Amino acid sequence: MPSFDIVSEVAMNEVQNAVENANREIQTRFDFRGVDASFELNKEEIKMGADADFQLKQMIEILRDKIVKRGMDTSCLDVGDVEHSGKRYFQVVKLKQGIETDVAKKLIKIIKDAKIKVQTAIQGDEIRVTGKKRDDLQEAMALVRQAELGQAFQFTNFRD
């Protein structure tokens, strides 16, 4: 029986490239001259630091622009609150990895409401979709692409 998996993953090498490009742009931009601003990539988050909170807003836009240029979806970013410490401002942007249970249930409900002849199963942080016909699976893929659940989804492990 044909099947595929729905996952939500972030290519960390692309994120690293986007962060490096954003750091380069901050160093060359005129409005960031003489400002101690930087992006720092940790395991699952990007920490931004600047001298003013409006600069953090500009830095988020720079980061989003660089991520889009790397071919990724910006819905994988979860922007945190601005923190003030001394004379610097910090903000943490978390990277969304995996499909949470409540999002998975909403996705399964969307597929089941369409009355497509497929079965769905939650397997950890991914969803397995199986069906008798390849066309049904492609229809389910189209539904998932149209669903706006605040997260980017990819399809892996397609088997006939």
From Swiss-Prot:
GO CC annotation terms, alphabetical: cytosol
Family: Belongs to the YajQ family.
InterPro entries per UniProt: DUF520 (IPR007551), UPF0234-like_C (IPR035571), UPF0234_N (IPR035570), YajQ-like_sf (IPR036183)
Keyword DNA repair: no
Classification via Pfam families: DUF520
Source taxonomy: Bacteria, Pseudomonadati, Pseudomonadota, Gammaproteobacteria, Aeromonadales
Coiled coil residues, start to end: none
GO molecular function: nucleotide binding
Species in which this protein is naturally found: Tolumonas auensis (strain DSM 9187 / NBRC 110442 / TA 4)
Biological role stated in the UniProt entry: Nucleotide-binding protein.
Membrane as UniProt keyword: no
Name of protein: Nucleotide-binding protein Tola_0795
Key words, A-Z: Nucleotide-binding
